Amino acid sequence: MKKINYIGLLLIVMVFSACDLDQYPYSEVAADKYVKDASSVNNLVLGCYNSLHDVMYYEWAMTELRSDNGRMYAAGSSSNTTRLVEQLDQGTIVPENEWVKTYWNACYATIARVNNVISYLDVVTDETLRNQYEGEVLFLRSLEYFNLVRLWGPVFIVTSKVPSEVARDMQRSTVDELLPGKMADGDLGRADLNSAKALLAKVYATHYQAGDEKYARAARLCKEVLESESVGNPQSGSDLVAYDKVFDIGNEMNKEIIFAVRYLSGNAGIGSPFGNMFAPVNNGANVIIGTSSGYNTPTDNIIAAYEQRGAGADKRLDVNIAQKYFNTTTQTWVTEGNCRYCKKYVNPVTTQYDGESDWPVIRVADIALLYAELTNEISGPSADNLKYLNMVCERAGVSTYTLTDLPSLYDFRKAVRNERRLELAFENQRWFDLLRWGIATQTVNNYLNSELLYTEYSYTVNDIEDWQTFLPIPVSVIDINPEIAQNTGY
C-alpha cells in the first residue's frame, strides 16, 4: 500500500475527532459537505488508515494474549482494566467485556469509513486514481472482515451506508457469505498490490483445505508476491532485510514490509501506544518514559521455544523479547520480578504513548512461510518449499533443514509451524495460526497447565473449551437487537 502522507493523516485526525460513529453495526457517517474532488477523497482514504490505530490498540489482546505467546505480567491485580485483560488471557471472557466491545466497534468504524469513501468515489474524475482509492479501501475493509470472521465467526455484512432502523433488524451472515464473496480476486486485485494478493492468500489458506482449488490458489498468490521486485524477489536469507532492521524506526517500510499500520511520534496524535502498554510496570522510566502497563508479557513457553530452536543463537529472541533492563539509579541490571517485556515495539519517546514503531500486518517472511506450509500440505516437502523455510531460518541465525531432516509432510509441517511462531511473535499472527491449524484449544491448554505464573493465582486457571475460541458478540449489540444469535456458550 502507499506510504501514508502524515500531514494528511494529521488533518484527518482533526476532521474526524468530533464524529460520533455508531458501530452496532451501523455504517452511517455524517455527510461530508467538503467532499468535492480527488483531494478531499484522498483525505477520507487517509482517515480509513488512521482508524486502524483504534483497531490495533486492542487487537493484540484479542489475538496474541489469547495464545501461548503473551500473558499478564503478574497474578493478583484488582484493577478493573486488568481484570478485563485477564479474561482474555485466561479464556474467561464474558459478553460484557469492554475491550471486546471496543475492538468490535473499532473494526466496524473502519468499515463505515471505507463505505463512506466508496460513496464519494464518483467525484474522482481520474479513473486511475479512482481505482487506486477503491483498491486501497477495499483492502482495508476486507482486512477487517477477515479478522472479524476469524474472531467471531459469522458477523454482519455492511458494504454501504445502512440506516440505523435497518441495522437494528440485521442478522449475522454466514462465513461463506463473508469470505469468498467479499474477498474475491476481482475485489481485492483491482489495485494490483502485493498486500491485496497476500491478504487473499491468507483468506484462502484459512477458509479452504488442501485439495480445494482456492487452497492451491493461495500458494500461487504467495509465490507471485515473493517473486515480485517490490519485495526484492528473495532467494536466500541474505536477500532479506536483517531481522533487527525490519522493525528499526530508522528503516520503516523496508522491503520486508508488505503492509503495516503506521505511527508517527512527535505529539501529533498518531504515535504508537505499545511501548508504554508493553513495558514492565514500575520500571522507573528505565525502559520508557511515562506509565507502563506490562501487558502482553512474553511467556516462559515462548522463551523456551526460542532457546530450544536456537540454543542461544536465534537472533529473533533479543529483538522480540527483553528479559532484563538497566536501572540507571542503582546502576544495576534488573533481572527479577517484572522485568520481562515485549521489546519489539519499545523505542525512546519524549511523551508517553507516543512511539514511532509501525505495526507489521503482513510481511515477506509471513508469506514465505505460508507458501512453504501450503505447498507442503498440497504435495509434501520439496526443494522449492524448503528454500523458503530455510530463507527465514538462515536470516534468524538458526540451523537450516535438509529434505533428509524433514522427509514427511508431518515433519515439514511441524518445522514450518514452529518457525512461524518464532518469526512472527507479537505480530498478532499466532492465535490466527492456531485457529487455522485446528489446534488452538489443545495448544493453549498445554500452555495454561505448564506456565509457572498461573500456579500463583488464588484460584484455578481452567482449561478452555472449543467454543471459547470465538469471542462473544458484545452485549451492547444484543441489547439493540435481541434477535441476534449469540455465539455458543456465552
Each language-model region and where it sits:
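Conserved, well-structured interaction surfaces
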Residues: 38, 42-54, 80-152, 168, ...
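Flexible, polar/acidic helix-loop-strand segments at domain edges
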Residues: 84-95, 301-364
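Short coil/turn linking the two alpha-helices of tandem helical-hairpin repeats
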Residues: 149-151, 156, 206-212, 377-380
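Bacterial Sec-dependent N-terminal signal peptides
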Residues: 1-27
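An aromatic- and glycine-enriched ligand-binding surface/loop that stacks and positions planar moieties
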Residues: 20-82, 190-328, 443-446
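Long, intrinsically disordered, low-complexity segments
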Residues: 19-21, 71-79, 94, 107-110, ...
